Amino acid sequence: MVKTLRPQNYNEAIYVGHFFRTGMPVVMDLNGLTDDEAKQFVDFAAGLVFGRGGDMDRLSPKVFLLMPHGRGNRVPTVEEAP
């Protein structure tokens, strides 16, 4: 199961952290945010993923997959795709 979140403001970052820390992959759809707000979320998510030993992949310009450590395979990047 993957949790998809479409935050409306930075106060909702707590939900990204909550689901990720419980071991659930999280898709962050940041299309509803300004570029500055989206950057804050990406910075938060990068720290979260680094600290917990997971992976973060960009699915589109403002959509990211956060994969907890030990939860399956990464999504191949454009460079890695066949």
Question: How would you describe each model-predicted region?
Answer:
Residues 1-34, 43-82:
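Positively charged, small/polar-rich N-terminal and surface patches that mediate targeting and assembly
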